[in-house]
């Protein structure tokens, strides 16, 4: 009813099919991984102008998400092909490059349209997460020119990426999540 498709998820990592283009002047990450650690409530002033409680103090439920640093493992550049996006070039820091992005690298294709950072989560830093195995995921790099995005992604290779590189305090963010999938048991 509320979720589609109604079946068990393929993996614990959510799959985003579209990245919203950003008009930021400097390159920035377009996503970050976090783990739900609980819920609580917050007292806040209702900011919605058409609400009946607009401007009044209200109590609202909030979800607490812990965001440990992610490790930037690699970088991929995509070009538009007949079947959609295809990998044009990629960088995996290796022993040859000393972990600074000079390792295994293909020639940079001039038809590149999109840059993504391959980042590894750190679930072992969060207590209460049953899996301690890291997940590898692609984070979009948006804003600035294409050359600036490539240089920004290269500068992050082999380093820890914090949530402060993605968003700032007080910003609104969209959240995509994967449920545990308890079947017919419990509330949806």
Predicted regions and their residues:
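Extended basic (Lys/Arg/His-rich) segments that typically form rRNA-contacting surfaces
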Residues: 1-188
């Amino acid at each position: 009813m509320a979720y589609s498709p109604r079946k068990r998820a393929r993996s614990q990592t959510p799959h985003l099919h579209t990245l919203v283009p950003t008009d930021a002047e400097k390159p920035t990450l377009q996503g970050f991984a976090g783990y739900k650690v609980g819920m609580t409530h917050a007292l806040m002033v209702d900011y919605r102008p058409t609400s009946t409680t607009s401007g009044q103090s209200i109590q609202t439920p909030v979800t607490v998400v812990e965001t440990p640093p992610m490790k930037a493992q690699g970088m991929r550049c995509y070009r538009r092909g007949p079947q959609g996006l295809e990998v044009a070039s990629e960088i995996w820091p290796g022993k040859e490059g000393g972990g600074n992005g000079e390792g295994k690298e293909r020639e940079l294709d001039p038809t590149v349209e999109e840059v993504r950072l391959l980042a590894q989560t750190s679930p072992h830093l969060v207590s209460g997460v049953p899996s301690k195995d890291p997940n590898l995921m692609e984070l979009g790099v948006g804003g600035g020119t294409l050359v600036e995005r490539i240089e920004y992604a290269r500068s992050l290779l082999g380093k820890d990426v914090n949530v402060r590189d993605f968003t700032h305090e007080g910003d609104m963010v969209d959240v995509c999540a994967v449920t545990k999938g308890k079947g017919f048991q419990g509330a949806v």
